[in-house]
């Protein structure tokens, strides 16, 4: 590995999924993993294998299917964790074990209730054990941003001696500033005698909005792996945004003088995919991938861009993969055109899924005069997000109007039995403050789950009076947030689909937890 190559370590499937409501099923995680591989991500952190059986299976499956990127699993500094992690990632062509252990006095004393000497011993022993299983082992010094510098350097030196191939310096709580963090990386590079035997990595959180700036400062001072997520998602205020780092290094390559192997024209597709699967919308003014990233309203700016794009644009839409034109399909479009458009949009789907999507496309095309790219993407994401469904919407009728009480009637199929092979149809009606509220109350009567709607948003997927509407929502069940989304030309139907998807996610997670 050349010393001036930046390694992109994507943790969307692990840290990114810790955003409330951002949990994904196995099918969705595979979609993201395949797209990250298409983007050219060097390392995909697929999950935390010991945290749940679902996470273990996801990491194992991704390890078996992705062949171009290294696949990492996160684990604590314990032999049990490391063994479980290895059992999940060992199927990968390029597996990595990622061990973390806190090094700040606050965490050592308050959380772990240990001494510095004990932490140093744990770090060395667990790295050696990890190395006995896997040749690629990463060590993360949790809360390095607030760790004593002398002790941090001592730990870094010791774990490299023990066999760590990458040492990660996280700003776990997003506390440091760019100058501070850059100086910390520079000091590690200067003081640790064996530092050149490992890659120095950084993992910055965005609590003060400085994650990208801190990561860039780290690059200037010798860090060569950046841990990040698509759209910057993650717990609390999120993580370093992969697309912002990638395009900064591309646009300002003469300043940073480093290289990377990402295919930046896949950034837009990757951003859209993650947004749709997690239910976390990208703000319109988000750098690089936001809807307004290449929009110009000022007359002076518009005039300049028309004369020479570089007057007000430092990068082109094509650099990040924004489609130059939207291909319009309709009810007369055939399989070939539809399948080709799906491929052009960056999706790799099996023949059975493609045929199923084509049938859904024809139904939509009968309702809409024109079907745009965003309509097709919405169909794909809705279809691939379903997972195992306990409840399926069969019928919906909702009425409302001036001077009338909104009412709704729904019929839902409920799968029963251990293998969900039997189903019964249930019906309920309810009144509400509006047609969506009435629909949700009718659904609640059937599902018999104490689920609470916490967030609801509706947007038009495409243009025109017959536009496809997309509802994205979050619902809480037994203390956990689940996301749901639904699309339809009927916004009441889209709302019902989104609610039922969140309910199915909650039911699946809770049943798995109970071992059903």
From Swiss-Prot:
What organism is the protein native to?
Endomicrobium trichonymphae
What segment(s) does the record annotate as region Regulatory domain?
Answer: 392-516
Instruction: Output the superkingdom of the source species.
Output: Bacteria
Per the record, a Pfam family?
HCS_D2
Protein's recorded name:
2-isopropylmalate synthase
Binding residues annotated for Mn(2+), in chain numbering: 15, 203, 205, 239
Domain Pyruvate carboxyltransferase intervals: 6-268
Source organism phylogeny: Bacteria, Pseudomonadati, Elusimicrobiota, Endomicrobiia, Endomicrobiales
What is the primary gene name for this protein? leuA
Q: How does it assemble?
A: Homodimer.
For the biological process aspect of GO, one term held by this record is: L-leucine biosynthetic process
